[in-house]
């Protein structure tokens, strides 16, 4: 049976080496996020200030996988 994951939205606050990011969730938790393979393959750029959806395991709530970059309303991308 596949593990149930929690999906949160958050803001990238800091870019770390090797595709890792510091993410502040909407509930004010600060966690470590890494880029999913699909985003890596699609060459989607994630920068500090971007809003993202992040998938967090029930067993380790300090790390998560970034699964989607939300579009900003003020940019043209």
From Swiss-Prot:
The entry's keywords: Chloroplast, Initiation factor, Plastid, Protein biosynthesis, RNA-binding, rRNA-binding
Broad class of where this protein is predominantly found: plastid
Subcellular location: Plastid, Chloroplast
Domain S1-like: 1-71
Domain of life from the UniProt record: Eukaryota
SMART domains: S1
InterPro entries the UniProt entry points to: NA-bd_OB-fold, RNA-binding_domain_S1_IF1, S1_domain, TIF_IF1
One GO term describing the cellular component: cytosol
GO molecular function ontology, one term from the record: rRNA binding
Listed PROSITE patterns: S1_IF1_TYPE
Keyword Repressor assigned: no
Pfam families in alphabetical order: eIF-1a (PF01176)
Described function: One of the essential components for the initiation of protein synthesis. Stabilizes the binding of IF-2 and IF-3 on the 30S subunit to which N-formylmethionyl-tRNA(fMet) subsequently binds. Helps modulate mRNA selection, yielding the 30S pre-initiation complex (PIC). Upon addition of the 50S ribosomal subunit IF-1, IF-2 and IF-3 are released leaving the mature 70S translation initiation complex.
Subunit structure: Component of the 30S ribosomal translation pre-initiation complex which assembles on the 30S ribosome in the order IF-2 and IF-3, IF-1 and N-formylmethionyl-tRNA(fMet); mRNA recruitment can occur at any time during PIC assembly.
Family classification: Belongs to the IF-1 family.
Name of the molecule in the record: Translation initiation factor IF-1, chloroplastic
Naturally occurring in which organism (per UniProt): Chloranthus spicatus
